[in-house]
């Protein structure tokens, strides 16, 4: 822009000088036709006046050049100011972007940790919550819960049981009131079945094959037991101190053992170790090879360990006749502990 202004003033100045010189030449011709003396006098005046006119023109030109320089400086200053403002704006934008990114990161962390925070609400029993507080803070547990939170949130494939029922087994009886522990492998993977208790299904859901076989064994083992045909809800056992624990507490729909590598085994092993250290006598019932691998965790001689095949139809012949229910009651009675009423009504 400054270059255009300078060109304009230079052209204007040149035009002014040319016009002044043309006027002087016209006057000079007019004076010559009058008289020689006048011509001489006029010529002298012109000679004397010419330097003044040229000086005035030069001065005017210098003013224009000075004005151009000031204009250039002003424009440069404006450009510098614009650059400065742009830098400030860029810095502000960068800060804003960083703050937004940090906010997103915090929000993401909060989102990931929501499930972990909710666990405080899922554990309603204070004794269990206190006993397991050390596990909640471990890296494997936080990683597992974060992973589970994403799986539950994505809804690509249903996860069972619902989040608020994962720890149901811990909320039916205080740690000090546990009498019998029955270890399962992982939850039922059919819709509407699992609710946090091993081998149990929700109200209104027909008993699965393994539970039907458990009922069959009870019919031959416990006098007066009548097998319910439509009720597989084992809550009455849980309320009496039967701890129905799966080694893995979650599963994807129609995909058994899908969460076996999530870290649940570390958690439930810690649970079993805590139970093993309890002074009150406990019966540990281990059905099948998977559950029997946990036997090494029970080093307390106060407890009783019972083993047999799994109640699944695939291994039923190694399960039927084990009499684990009557044996559990005999042990509890011998220790002065109230026996379990194994009855399940329709």
UniProtKB/Swiss-Prot annotation:
Gene3D superfamilies per record: Uracil-DNA glycosylase-like domain (3.40.470.10)
Location of this chain's protein in the cell: Mitochondrion; Nucleus
Principal location class: mitochondrion
Active site: 186
Top-rank taxon: Eukaryota
The keyword DNA repair belongs to this UniProt entry's keyword annotation: yes
Pfam families (alphabetical): UDG
Enzyme Commission identifier(s): 3.2.2.27
BP terms from Gene Ontology: base-excision repair, AP site formation via deaminated base removal
Keywords annotated in UniProt: DNA damage, DNA repair, Hydrolase, Mitochondrion, Nucleus
Reaction it catalyzes: Hydrolyzes single-stranded DNA or mismatched double-stranded DNA and polynucleotides, releasing free uracil
Keyword Hydrolase in annotation: yes
Molecular-function GO terms, alphabetical: uracil DNA N-glycosylase activity
Function per UniProt: Excises uracil residues from the DNA which can arise as a result of misincorporation of dUMP residues by DNA polymerase or due to deamination of cytosine.
Protein name: Uracil-DNA glycosylase
Organism per entry: Dictyostelium discoideum (Social amoeba)
Organism taxonomic ancestry: Eukaryota, Amoebozoa, Evosea, Eumycetozoa, Dictyostelia
């Amino acid at each position: 822009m400054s270059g255009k202004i300078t060109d304009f003033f230079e052209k204007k100045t040149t035009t002014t000088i040319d016009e002044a010189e043309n006027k002087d030449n016209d006057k000079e011709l007019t004076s010559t036709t009058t008289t020689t003396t006048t011509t001489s006098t006029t010529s002298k005046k012109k000679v004397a006046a010419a330097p003044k006119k040229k000086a005035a023109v030069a001065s005017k030109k210098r003013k224009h050049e000075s004005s151009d320089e000031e204009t250039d400086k002003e424009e440069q200053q404006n450009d510098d100011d614009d650059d400065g403002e742009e830098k400030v704006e860029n810095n502000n934008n960068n800060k804003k972007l960083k703050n937004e990114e940090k906010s997103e990161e915090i929000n993401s962390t909060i989102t990931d940790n929501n499930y972990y925070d909710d666990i405080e609400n899922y554990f309603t029993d204070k004794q269990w919550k206190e006993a397991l507080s050390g596990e909640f803070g471990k890296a494997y547990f936080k990683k597992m819960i974060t992973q589970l939170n994403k799986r539950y949130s994505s809804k690509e494939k249903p996860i069972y049981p619902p989040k608020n029922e994962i720890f149901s087994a811990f909320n039916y009886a205080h740690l000090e009131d546990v009498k019998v522990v029955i270890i399962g492998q992982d939850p039922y993977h059919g819709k509407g079945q699992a609710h946090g208790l091993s081998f149990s299904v929700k109200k209104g859901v027909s008993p699965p094959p393994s539970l039907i076989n458990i009922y069959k064994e009870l019919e031959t083992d416990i006098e007066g037991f009548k097998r319910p045909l439509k009720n597989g809800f084992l809550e009455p056992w849980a309320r009496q101190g039967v701890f129905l624990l799966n080694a893995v507490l979650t599963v994807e729909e129609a995909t058994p053992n899908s969460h076996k590598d999530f870290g649940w085994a570390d958690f439930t092993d810690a649970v079993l170790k805590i139970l093993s250290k309890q002074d009150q006598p406990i019966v540990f019932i281990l059905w099948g090879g998977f559950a029997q691998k946990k036997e090494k965790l029970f080093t307390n001689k106060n407890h009783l360990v019972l083993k047999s095949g799994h109640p699944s139809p695939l291994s039923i012949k190694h399960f039927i006749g084990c009499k684990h229910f009557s044996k559990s009651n005999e042990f509890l009675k011998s220790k002065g502990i109230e026996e379990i009423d194994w009855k399940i009504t329709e």
